[in-house]
Regions:
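Short alpha-helical interface segments
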Residues: 12-13, 21, 25-89
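A short, N-terminal "cap"/entry segment at the start of jelly-roll beta-barrel domains
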Residues: 74-123
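Conserved short histidine dyad/triad with adjacent acidic residue
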Residues: 112-144, 173-177
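Glycine- and acidic-residue-biased ligand/ion/polar-headgroup-sensing regions
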Residues: 134-137, 143-159, 166
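Short beta-strand His + acidic residue motifs that chelate non-heme Fe in jelly-roll/DSBH
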Residues: 139-141, 160, 178-184
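Short acidic-glycine-tyrosine-enriched beta hairpin
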Residues: 159-179
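Ligand-binding loop in jelly-roll beta-barrel domains
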Residues: 176-200
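Double-stranded beta-helix
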Residues: 191-217
Length: 217
């Protein structure tokens, strides 16, 4: 079970299919790695399907109908689904849901000493990337002007909000400033989804933030 689960409202929107593709990808990876999140999404989808059945049958969707649906679901155990193994060499850590976005892309060195793979999405303005930090290394100190969604796929990292391991999900609000540092051991790999470019707050921020805003870094 994840120590840092995705918020309930995100799981609900994911189950309902109303999340933009970027956040939906992040939640899907969290669900693939965390059995508790997977069970929650399965139950939410079952509730939605059962309520639709009640509506199609012409029944009132009041409290009594909802209680009836929940009573039926309480007797159903949702078993975790085993995911098929990854097939791409060097990416054994990647859940299958991620592989179709990668194609033949490989790691590229980025400013700050980390590596990244940019993931382009059609029709979604979120910026999505895989980041890889070597043990003990960190990202530059930065803050966000909009939400950031992070799901850890390998290793772990620590910042001022806590320690995050495989399957953990983090939501960074715009006011938050942090400096994630990879834990000792293996490299930390995480999927990052941001609504808007980050703002560097360290010594180099004045010079590099314009490049970040224009997507040149």
């Amino acid at each position: 079970m994840s120590r840092h689960p995705a918020p309930d409202e995100l799981l609900l929107d994911y189950a309902a299919g109303v999340l933009p593709e970027g956040p939906a990808l992040a939640v899907s990876l969290h669900v693939a790695l965390d059995p508790a999140a997977r069970r929650a999404v399965d139950r939410l989808r079952a509730v939605g399907g059962a309520l639709l059945e009640e509506e199609e049958a012409g029944l009132e969707l009041g409290d009594a109908a909802l209680e009836s649906v929940m009573a039926r679901l309480d007797g159903v155990a949702v078993e975790p689904k085993a995911a098929p193994p990854a097939r791409r060499p060097g990416f054994e850590w990647a859940p299958p849901a991620l592989l179709r976005y990668l194609g033949g892309k490989d790691w590229k060195r980025a400013f700050g000493g980390f590596e990244q793979i940019e993931i382009g999405l059609h029709g979604d303005t979120h910026r999505v990337a895989l980041l890889r930090l070597q043990p003990g290394k960190g990202l530059p100190v930065h803050r966000h002007v909009a939400n950031e969604f992070t799901v850890v796929l390998q290793g772990g990292y620590t910042d001022n909000t806590g320690n995050y391991g495989v399957g953990d999900f983090a939501v960074g609000p715009g006011a938050q400033q942090h400096e994630p540092i990879a834990d000792p051991g293996e490299p930390c790999i995480a999927l990052i989804v941001v609504e808007k470019p980050i703002v560097l707050t360290g010594a180099w921020g004045r010079w590099l933030n314009p490049l970040l805003r224009w997507g040149w870094m």
